Amino acid sequence: MSKQHWSRNAARALLGTVLSVAAATAISAPTRWDVNGHYYEVIEVSGGIVWADARAAAQTTSHFGASGHLVTVGSAEESRFLTASFGGDGLENHWLGLFQPVGSSEPDGGWTWVNGESFSYNNWWPGEPNDFGIDGENAGVFQHGITGDGKGWNDLNSDWLVNGYVVEFDVVPEPTMLMLFAGGLLGLTLTRRR
């Protein structure tokens, strides 16, 4: 592939990301889940967005100093919280932070969360993941009309355009009392030495 051809493709990809992010609209302010202290936000993208652009856009956001990433769902309780907070229709056709690395056994091997959390919980719609189609499916999406229990993940090709994505903001650790006390003691010691 020539440098000019590669540069043109890179420019198109960059332009696609910029336009997708520019067209992104938050449905509401980030919502906090008291169980883990994380915040969640559903982002709609006019004209749709591919998985890689959604991942990049999520990573450029922050809320109260916490960096964002595509949502990782680690339990049925967290899944129910998302459905209760945003509704099944609000999550429908939005990217998760779930992907299948190249070379994984198909259709259900190697699924990985973007933040490295263990993939011990899944919420696949019955019959999913199925790696349908000739191009394969390697990214997770909320789909199939989420039911009350949050059932409804599907695997899609990461290059397909979907309605948006869900961002999760991890909690920013607050200083513990012991750290505050130690810092105060250190400050007092340094002041007395002068």
What would you call each of these model-derived segments?
Residues 16, 26-27:
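Cleavable N-terminal signal peptides
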Residues 173-191:
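A short, hydrophobic C-terminal helix/tail in secreted or cell-surface proteins
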Residues 12-20, 178-183:
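Small-residue packing motifs within transmembrane alpha-helices
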Residues 5, 9, 52, 189-191:
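Short alpha-helical segments used as structural interaction elements across diverse proteins
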Residues 2-14, 175-176:
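Bacterial N-terminal signal peptides that target proteins for export
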Residues 27-171:
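Extracellular, disulfide-bonded carbohydrate-recognition/adhesion ectodomains
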